[in-house]
A protein has these predicted regions:
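Conserved acidic segment of CheY-like receiver
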Residues: 1-13, 17-21, 50
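C-terminal output helix
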Residues: 86-87, 104-113
Length: 139
């Protein structure tokens, strides 16, 4: 069972989201992190997947994601109202696996999570192959 950490910087209630994820069979971590606490909570709780609900990801959030992704990469889904192309590129560069605009709809969660998990697994394999090739070249 995958462990999911929810991160939000909005005032929207997230009970429906938590319920939908639980119905899909995900283990919901007890704490809903704020972007500022992301790195600390990821280190202590070790979620398998992170879902971020934000109006617009802040520079601090993206920096925390980049640090987390460098230390212990994991799939990150970001739901945002901000469709700014540069912001989307920055989010992907920080480690966001899937960036979705137009808000978080619980009925779309299952396919979105499946795509994000598959893409993350593929990227992880590529990173491993790259590291192996670099090691072989160094020898």
């Amino acid at each position: 069972m995958l462990r999911v950490l929810l991160v939000t910087d909005t005032d929207k209630p997230i009970g429906d989201l938590r319920d939908a994820l639980a119905r899909l069979g995900y283990d919901m971590l007890a704490e809903t992190a704020t972007p500022e606490a992301l790195h600390r909570i990821v280190q202590s709780e070790r979620p398998d997947v992170i879902i971020i609900d934000t109006e617009s990801p802040s520079r601090d959030t993206l920096e925390q994601l980049a640090v987390m992704n460098a230390a212990a990469p994991r799939p990150v889904l970001m739901f945002s109202a901000d469709a700014n192309q540069q912001l989307i590129r920055d989010a992907v560069g920080a480690g966001v696996t899937a960036y979705l605009v137009e808000g978080l709809a619980t009925e779309r969660l299952a396919p979105i999570l499946e795509v994000a998990l598959a893409r993350f697994a593929q990227e992880s394999q590529l990173r491993e192959r790259l590291a192996q090739a670099e090691n072989e070249l160094a020898e």
